[in-house]
């Protein structure tokens, strides 16, 4: 694979880890072994990349992941022969990946729900959409391929209902608003998302529920489902999600991770056509933090 450096000034190993899927250590390994070329030449890790440099690197073979059903507690809000709705706890990864082969939502689903759709492959059975590891709340699960196709199409057509509660930094100037700003991979750090003209359209609606001076409780409704959408949009308007260590400030509310909860989920049942809507209460630590902010 190759990338073209748009902004110079970084060490070669740092540029590779920021702009590609390689970790810093793997980038260094490839540089030392001569697998990384800059404009066709081998360079050392300390080389400072320049604007216009073409860097060629090696994409490692994907790991063969082994995973099993695990008896992990899981709150199943609803279940029938086609779909299920689960309340994912904060801190749980949705599906297995390198470094996360156990303890994921998929491991739990395989234990609690025997029939899952296979459209997303063996690593993501039943998974129609995702929420971040540190976001709690509702997810729809497909139990067969027909249901999966229907639910995925509804998400694509922006017909499903997804509302979140978040504690954010600061006091928003308006009680309601719409954030319409395209989101794509950050050009400065490829592991992050950012508002960028090259991104895909992204729309988030917000409603301030309660104000606490330095923080606000906000309900957000997604019209699109970009990676990290709420976190990126709220940071973009200067009110990042509290506890967000990636897009927020270092000084923030402690003890929970990010205060973001997928509270309401609505969709059309793929078989019956019935409109279903579910709500999951915010976690106890979220409630305790709100009580503390009110004092």
Segments (PLM) and residue ranges:
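RNA pseudouridine synthases
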Residues: 1-295
């Amino acid at each position: 694979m190759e990338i073209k450096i748009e902004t110079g000034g970084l060490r070669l190993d740092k540029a590779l880890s920021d702009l590609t899927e390689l970790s810093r250590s793997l980038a260094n390994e490839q540089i030392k072994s001569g697998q990384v070329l800059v404009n066709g030449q081998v360079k050392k890790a300390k080389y400072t990349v320049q604007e216009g440099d073409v860097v060629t690197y090696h994409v490692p073979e994907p790991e063969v992941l082994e995973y099993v059903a695990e008896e992990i507690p899981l709150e199943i809000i609803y279940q029938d022969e086609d779909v299920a709705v689960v309340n994912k706890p904060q801190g749980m990864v949705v599906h297995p990946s390198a470094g996360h082969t156990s303890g994921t939502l998929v491991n739990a689903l395989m234990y609690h729900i025997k029939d899952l759709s296979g459209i997303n492959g063996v690593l993501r059975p039943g998974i129609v959409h995702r929420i971040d590891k540190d976001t709690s709340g509702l997810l729809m699960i497909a139990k067969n391929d027909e249901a999966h196709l229907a639910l995925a199409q509804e998400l694509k057509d922006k017909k499903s209902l997804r509302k979140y509660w978040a504690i954010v930094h600061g006091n928003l100037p308006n009680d309601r608003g719409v954030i319409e700003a395209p989101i794509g991979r950050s050009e400065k750090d490829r592991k992050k998302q950012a508002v960028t003209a090259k991104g895909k359209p992204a729309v988030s609606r917000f409603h301030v529920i309660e104000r606490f001076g330095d923080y606000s409780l906000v309900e957000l409704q997604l019209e699109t489902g970009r990676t990290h959408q709420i976190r990126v949009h709220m940071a973009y308007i200067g009110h990042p999600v509290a506890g967000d260590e990636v897009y927020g400030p270092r000084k923030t509310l402690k003890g929970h991770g990010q205060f973001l909860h997928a509270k309401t989920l609505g969709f059309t049942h793929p078989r019956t056509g019935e409109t279903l809507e579910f709500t999951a209460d915010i976690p106890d630590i979220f409630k305790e933090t709100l009580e503390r902010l009110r004092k």
